[in-house]
Swiss-Prot record:
It is an enzyme of class 3 (hydrolase). GO terms for molecular function: nuclease activity. This is Putative pre-16S rRNA nuclease. It comes from Pseudomonas syringae pv. tomato (strain ATCC BAA-871 / DC3000). Keywords: Cytoplasm, Hydrolase, Nuclease, Ribosome biogenesis. It is found in: Cytoplasm.
Amino acid sequence: MAALRLLLGIDYGTKQIGVAVGQAITGQARELCTLKAQNGVPDWDKVQALINEWKPDAIVVGLPLNMDGTPSEMSARAEKFSRKLNGRFGVTVYTHDERLTTFEAKGERMARGGQKGSYRDNPVDAIAAALLLQGWLDEHPELLNV
């Protein structure tokens, strides 16, 4: 397997999908954007545009497990979304445990100066995507081209 240089991280949701970018050379992930979704279905043209722009070597999709580590209803949907990403775009897709990333993202937003308005109007999904991608980068240094 070729070493990975650039990855996208995705915090999958039914209404919003957070996107982050991470680079092997820095070992860091940062928030990128939030895509709207309808019942978990994104605007696939916008997903295609992100893939065309960033040309990721792989995508990491957050897997929302229950606190005891068992799959949740959303886990199955996130896995299905992962398979669709792979099938549509031919990019390698990994999943990563994302327990508590949204909670942590809300805390990070508060630390940055607080939440302005509702989370629907000012979402934390891209922050959550960066957190889950950072976790994956930290756990898989052997796959990175550094």
